[in-house]
Amino acid sequence: MIRLTTKQRFPPFVRKVVRDFSQMTVGQEVVEETESVIVIKNLLDLTEIPFENTIKHMFVIAKTMHDDAVTALETRNMSLAEDVVKRDMDVDRLNWLIARQTNMIMQNASLLRKMRISTTLAMHYYIISWIIERIGDHAVRMAENTQPIIYLDLDKKILAAIKKASSLSMENFDRSIISFFNADMKDANRNIESIHSLEAICGEINNMVLKQDTLVAIHVGYIAESVRRAGEYSCDISETVINLLIEKENGPP
């Protein structure tokens, strides 16, 4: 429970911060509010929400955000680009949920038995959650950089290259999550090795935009950068999978 007090009365910005916090977190609700007291309480039993379900939910949201950012650029859909930006809070909320669950587990060993999870696996879930949150952030950057050029006539070759790079990036994302849930070290290694194809295409995009006007060159360059970073973050998930499997194989020290 969080209890906020003041000797006088809360200024409007404090109440806004409290509302924003309640909206961006899972289960945290204002249960008492006066001029000088605000009480926030967790109304959700976090132990009843499996880590696996949350990760899968985050994956679907982040991947859809990425795909929609590219679709918005291709179809000149401003409302879709704006919606991608708004969805970022959904990923942030779920990342916060896993962070809170992990913190609870580290402080109370009995929760490990209740949630049927080890501290090692919980920490790896948290790491993967953070990485997915970063992939969502790059989808937002793609959508934000789409908006200034959305109504311009983008070179078809550049658009095709962005779509190809995006497809490779999300294939990496798919494989990284699959390798995690399947505990597949070989697939995780193959995923890491495949990043070179994505990096090559993103390099080609950066060369293509040199012939474009400054506005297009800048924003397409940022889009390509975020597509590449999403793929690289996916490789980070694969590296996490490998580390987890090695730890399991070696057992406790």
Indicate where each model-derived feature is located.
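Cytosolic, long alpha-helical scaffolding segments
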Residues: 1-253
